[in-house]
């Protein structure tokens, strides 16, 4: 294994800490979360809310890497007008390149996102994280971010995650 390539990949992954979430920037959120903070939020939700029939370890791995490709392609949102198939192709190419030189193959985790029971659960937690963050920013900064909550609700099945995303009132902070 080439340590120079491994070091480069490890350092590049750390830049997720500096990449702000594009949707929050577009809406004028002050000090918006980074993509890395979002990924942590999704992993936190997976850890805490994982049902017994879901492999928690697999789901956590998927949550950690689910937005890694954004290092290279950026945080593409529906407002950017990028065709979903084009976005997926860009992200797959970026992830494949980022996977090179690592001592572990991360490709199965990115391929599982949305496509396995664990991947679908992580995708649901991704939507829940967005809704909860919208509630938080709305409460703290007085912003109208209902579109993010509505977007999450449109993709969440009835049950606990949907109830949490709907949030009857702003959370106490």
Task: Name every feature range the model reports, one short phrase each.
Residues 1-173:
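Active-site helical microenvironments for divalent-metal-assisted chemistry
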């Amino acid at each position: 294994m080439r340590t120079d390539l491994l070091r480069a990949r490890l350092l590049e992954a750390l830049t997720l800490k500096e990449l702000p979430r594009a949707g929050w920037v577009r809406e004028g959120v002050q000090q918006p979360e980074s993509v890395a903070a979002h990924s942590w939020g999704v992993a936190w939700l997976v850890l805490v809310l994982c049902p017994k029939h879901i492999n928690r370890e697999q789901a956590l791995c998927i949550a950690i890497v689910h937005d890694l490709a954004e290092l290279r392609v950026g945080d593409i949102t529906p407002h950017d007008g990028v065709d979903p198939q084009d976005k997926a192709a860009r992200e797959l190419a970026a992830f494949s390149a980022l996977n090179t030189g690592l001592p572990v193959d991360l490709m199965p985790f990115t391929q599982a996102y949305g496509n396995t029971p664990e991947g679908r659960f992580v995708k649901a937690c991704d939507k829940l994280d967005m809704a909860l963050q919208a509630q938080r920013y709305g409460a703290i900064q007085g912003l109208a971010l209902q579109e993010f909550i509505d977007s999450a609700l449109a993709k969440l099945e009835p049950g606990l995650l949907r109830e949490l995303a709907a949030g009857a009132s702003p959370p106490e902070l």
